[in-house]
């Protein structure tokens, strides 16, 4: 009767009258929720479960600073730039950017072998600094 999930990174509730799908959102990198973390509290009235969707601001600047300090930026600069943009704006998830990069590359190479020039062009076209 209930499906509770969170992998889409967006809070939401859908029902067809019989089944209810409840998405708690994302604590780390939510979509459409810049500089906020998301969670959900489920309460029961004894008959049904009701979701309460909550969002809290958190210190995104510290998270970004820690990404730089961890060395991850050096190992994966494009992933880090996309993540920073997503944390700041709530827009352009990694999959969307990856699809754009692969399209620019005419789907000729696997994602892990695509030249940096395609990544740079994609991030520039999408407005990711």
Which residue stretches match the model-derived regions?
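Short active-site oxyanion
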Residues: 1-2, 50
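Active-site neighborhood of phospho(di)ester-bond hydrolases with catalytic His/Asp-centered motifs
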Residues: 2-9, 21-25
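Residue-level recognition of beta-strand microenvironments
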Residues: 11-13
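Acidic, His/Gly-rich catalytic cores of divalent-metal-dependent hydrolytic chemistry
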Residues: 15-24, 28-129
